[in-house]
Amino acid sequence: MKTIEDIILDFDQRNISSLRKHLPTNFCGEASHLILENPGTVLIATGFYILAGGAAETDGPPGAIALGDALNLLGYKVFYITDRYSKPFVEAISKDNKVIEFPICS
């Protein structure tokens, strides 16, 4: 039977699975316990400018917002951190969560 960790790494296109040998077998379960046992404020970094591509990333912000929405439902205060290129987009989809501009790229 596949674990959630197996499913996550099944379509690994960025070689993240090479880190698996350095992680606990149940890394998703351990991460969820860590989150649930530490309520409060969460910072989620997303939407950074890709120098080689000449544009802001587009796949990260929607997933980051979904994660933030789930954490809001669990009572967490969520802040998104992004650069000036992605800030308007992240603000547009982030509902009531605060977006902090971080000068990662000039």
Language model segments and positions:
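Histidine-anchored nucleotide/phosphate-binding helix
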Residues: E57-G75
